[in-house]
Amino acid sequence: MTHKELNELLCDMSLEEKIGQLVQVPGSCYEEGAVITGGMNNGWREETCRLAGSTLGIYGAEKLKKIQDDYLKTQPHKIPLMFMLDVIHGHKTVFPCPLAQGATFSPETSEKCAEAAAKETGASGVQVTFAPMADLVRDSRWGRVMESTGEDPYLNGKMAAAMVKGFQGEDVGEKGKIASCIKHVAAYGGAVAGLDYQNAELSEHTLREFYLPAYKAAVDAGCEMAMTSFNLLNGVPSSGNKWLMRDVLRGEWGFDGVLISDWAAVGEMVAHGYCEDNTEAAVKAIETGVDIEMCTPAYADHLETLVKEGKVSEKLIDEAVMRVLMLKNKLGLFENPYKDADEQLEREIQLCDAHRSLARQAVRESIVLLKNDSTDSDAGKKLLPINTADGMKIAFVGPYVEGQDMRSSWSVSGDEKDNVTLKTAAQEIFGGAALAEGLEEKQPGVLLRFAEGCTLLDNHTIVNLGQYDEDNWEEINASLLSEAEECAKWADVVVLALGEHRFQTGEATSRTQIELPHIQLELLRRVASVNKSIVTVLFNGRPLDLREVSKYSKAVVEAWMPGTEGGHGIMDVLTGEYNPSGKLPMSFPYNVGQLPMCYNHYSSGRPKPEGSRGDYNCRYLDAPNEPLYPFGYGLSYTSFEIGSVNLSSDSVTSGEKITASVTVKNTGKSKGSELIQLYIRDVAASRVRPIKELKGFKHIELMPGEEKKVSFDIDEELLSFFRADGSFGSEPGKFKVWIADSSLTEGDAAELTLRD
């Protein structure tokens, strides 16, 4: 439709019909047996469901086409229903969780994953995804860190923009594309004490420097929607924050898409104490510019009366409705209300070979090798990759050896039965089928045994959506631990597969203790008492306290929540088929008491002296200041040497750029890929700058003995920041420049001067 036709449509709509376009109801309102009336059984008025402009949480081409047909029969102007779904890291093919994708440092890979997810989702009849999440995260007590790409605004911005492009392409109306929704605006990840839904208290400077840039990157990439966050931001709920939504999001950034609240966030402004009732919440939300209210009836129940009483301008309603209509028009729904819904394509494309292959590659790239010590028998040989010579005995032990549910939270449409387990992948690689009792398999050259080791959880553990209780928990684990010890005694190498339950991460999963379950640590200790050659593979959605894991393991592999192709991707790395190149997108703390933490913090007036305890300075008495594993860290099966930084000029002025470069050499014995990272520090400024900031990264692949030059451009824009007066720009002065393999790598920095 043309803009003129959309205006004519808007003018012809009744007020009730307009308000309906601003209401989103749960998909259960339209499920089987509900004549567009199922809302009556779900607390929603029949008329609200009949006129609602969008719904969420349901998928399936045949089902959604029927719902659309039934819906359109009741529509005065035949405006199609819009279907939305949480497609966070895949639909039926589940890719690694976003935090794992952050570890790839590959926007290109994330773009491909989003593109594949869009194709699968579109074929299922869904037109909008509530992704990507660009919340900056510094506190792994907060469960939704798994949905972010990490603690760095530069990395998050690159990843968010790539995902938007993958979902939407150049034209969201094209086949195989869906609209994306950047969330959660803003600073949902800044919750006090990592407690979900809690207030975020952040200065405007901190917001603009760290928390807002990734959202803006998604807006600049053309995201069609944005979502308000649940939380208070400096005492004001995001769904009622005019400064944030109208001044910044729409005014400064030029966002002209649809703004939707998170689930019930408009109504929750009453619980926050910001509004007396839903009537006031409706007023504040529409004045803030919230176009669609998700799953609470403040708009449906009160907006019509508020307009008629003159308490809300109908102009505000019209502006919001027009944005909704424009999105439906961009999606092509007026011409084809089903968009890409296609039962045959749905069967063909979901979990297709191409998508599984992409998922496997994404798993490979996301894996971070945290530790790899030498074997006891050969000080010159690392434990990984696993030796698969004749007669080698490998034991796979732990709850994730056969545990299929590696999907992570927010993989709502994936199915654990489609996931490749570690055991399945190991059997495929080494051949043969399991014996009747599943204990031992003889292969040409390799012997395998498998043991569950222990239960995944301690008894009476609370997870999201429930609590784990087992009457015979102690007896079960006594037997499993004994079996694991026997397995470990027999083996040359033990692959220990440990981790969190998928519902220990995600929404509403804040934790004050971030170690592995106690029973898993007991398994680790028991195995270590009989076999020191332990490779621990971790399945988790947040940085954990890994002190014990690191202590008892010769090798530690961070596999995150890897999704559908987890087993294949992990085995590719363990066997050396793929040389790990992932890097941590979030610091792993030494212990929970360090949280929140980040690499790009500010310097103290009393910094802790290098290599000494020091007195009356910025330090902990009982722990190091540094994380156990820092941001940007990750090992390889080969080794790399990074030379000194060379600047093409030691000064730069406005309008100019210089080049910072290093020579990187593969000094090991195998081909490998290294992530070369550019960090910059502003030495002195009107507002103190972080000790180090990521400003660029590049992957480089080298053969043994090969060396290449890696270069980064540096210009005034890269050196700019939010100054003391609140403006964004640069200041003349000195800068330090590092090019390294992690944020903690120390060495001589090159010095650069920015001149007027």
Segments the model singles out, each with a brief description of its role:
Residues 1-723, 729-745, 752-756:
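Glycoside hydrolase catalytic-domain context in secreted enzymes
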